[in-house]
Structures are given as C-alpha cells and as structure tokens.
Amino acid sequence: MVCAPEAQREITATLGITPTLVTVPTWTDHVYSCTYQYPDGSFVLSVKELDNVKETVAYYDGYRARLGERPGPIALGNGAFVTTDGSVVVRKDFKVLLVDTSHLPLRFGAPPQDRSDAGLSVAATVMSCWTGA
C-alpha cells in the first residue's frame, strides 16, 4: 500500500529524494495513512476505503468543496484534481487517495519541481501500483 517499503522506494525514485522518516501507518475510520518526512517539509498520503460508488463520489466531491480545485483535467484513476494548495486527490473504484503536499516547500525534489507536480508524480506512482489502475 502507500506506506509499504515498495511504495517508499518507488516514491523516492520518482521524487529523487529520500525521506528522513516514513511514519508508522495508521488505520482510522477506514483511512490508511502515513507521513513522508524530509529535512525541509513533509507530505501525507492517505487512502479512504468506501463501500460503493455513491459514497466514494461524495467523499471525493467533499475534498473538492473543502480544498478547492485548480483548473485542468488530470488523467488518473476514475477522476482526479489538484487542490488550490497543490495537493492531489484521486478517485479509483471505492477508494480516494489524498496526496497532501501543503507542508512541502513550493519547490521540492531533485531536481526541484512545483509541489503540485511533486504531488502528481506521487499520485501517478501510487496509482501505477494499484491493481487495475
């Protein structure tokens, strides 16, 4: 999953920078999450598991309402968008992925890229590991 050693290796390769710590994953209210910490910031990966399409779409749309949406389509999963703070939300089957980049510097990675691009790279990496993504 998003916090497993395989995901950590893939995300490190994608961003070109190794985290100083990946927190122990938590599972609360059907949300699996962990934080990737770096010397100059961090991001949180979380996946909410839902029971059906209606619940999944409502949860996904709730993020859009709370976090806002930058213009432009994102071709990931069954729907995706970049929030106004550069975080990324992806809906796939009955799961919603949030890559919360709000605690990263505006430019992050090696080579440095806009934090929203870093979030998109992480989301694409995670989606490539999900069966049928």
Where do the PLM segments sit?
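Short, solvent-exposed recognition patches
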Residues: 14, 18-84, 92-93
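Soluble, non-membrane globular domain cores that form compact, hydrophobic packing
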Residues: 2-18, 60-61, 113-117, 121-133
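A short, solvent-exposed beta-edge/loop patch
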Residues: 69-133
